[in-house]
Amino acid sequence: MLVETKAKVGVFSIALGAYLPQFPSLVPEFEAQYDAFKKTLPDTVEIIDGGMVTTKEQSQAAGDLFRAADVDLVFLQLLTYATSYNMLPAVKDLDVPVVLVNIQKLKALDYDHTDIASWLGEGYACGAVGEMVADL
């Protein structure tokens, strides 16, 4: 008998929580980027949504959700710089592949008109990978 099942895919995004009070415009920017990323995932998988993580407590909650759902794979979207405490509690003790998704929103920044918030929100994700990979 053939049983149709969907892979359970844990999905979450991370950003450094300290940036958000300093640059409140990042919150809707990051939420929009995370929503857009989730929409790229096919409907042939079951998404277990860990949300946008900016603290170690949120990371732990996402990890608890992933463990309870017994996910098959995790996608982690890097929104901007974040420390390993944003990532590690969510993926520790999971015996599944973890894919770091590091996509810069724009092909190139308009440097003449870029401020700190737009740099952090639209152009810095690629600078965040080193520490994450080292900790994994």
Q: Where are each of the predicted segments found?
A:
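An N-terminal assembly and electron-transfer interface module characteristic of large anaerobic redox
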Residues: M1-L136
